[in-house]
């Protein structure tokens, strides 16, 4: 059982579904982005996919947004996120065949932006595209809106569209 105000169960939080199955893509995208904005200014916490009361890391932020929009990103999960070996769930999301790959030039609000670690071809970061070359992401020190390409993340691995 999750006890609020403690670290017990911090990664057992799953955002409530905020879009109905019959609603259009826009409703699902806005539910995802609305959930992400609940974390604005909250601390970046390594390996964390918790409630907005605590904070999240980058893939935790995306997972909570996906839950709110109506996607359970199995086998990636909030509960398993803190377990050893799952720290890099951005890689798992990037490899997820259920998420449609789209060209960078075709990116749209609600798409996921994946980044390579500098000097490698290893995915190490993910953010939610807001439009107008801006993303919402969790990166030290906190959840923020940033340019799609910036000094920390400037090698884009690809774009995936969770809501078709």
Regions found by a protein language model. Give the residues of each.
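Intrinsically disordered, low-complexity
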Residues: 1-45, 105, 153-164
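Short, surface-exposed linear patches
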Residues: 59-60, 67-69, 135-137, 150-152, ...
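Intrinsically disordered, low-complexity segments enriched in small/polar residues
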Residues: 6, 11, 56, 113-114
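Secreted/periplasmic proteins that engage bacterial cell-wall peptidoglycan
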Residues: 26-96
């Amino acid at each position: 059982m999750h006890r609020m105000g403690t670290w017990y169960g911090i990664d057992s939080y799953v955002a409530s579904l905020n879009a109905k199955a019959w609603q259009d893509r826009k409703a699902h995208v806005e539910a995802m982005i609305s959930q992400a904005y609940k974390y604005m200014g909250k601390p970046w916490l390594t390996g964390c996919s918790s409630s907005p009361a605590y904070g999240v890391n980058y893939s935790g932020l995306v997972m909570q947004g996906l839950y709110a929009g109506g996607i359970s990103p199995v086998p990636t999960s909030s509960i398993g996120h803190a377990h050893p070996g799952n720290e890099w769930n951005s890689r798992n999301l990037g490899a997820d065949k259920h998420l449609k790959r789209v060209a960078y030039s075709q990116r749209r609000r609600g798409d996921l932006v994946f980044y390579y670690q500098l000097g490698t071809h290893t995915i190490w970061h993910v953010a939610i595209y807001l439009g107008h070359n801006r993303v919402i992401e969790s990166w030290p020190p906190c959840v923020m809106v940033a340019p799609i390409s910036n000094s920390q993340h400037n090698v884009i691995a690809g774009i995936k569209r969770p809501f078709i």
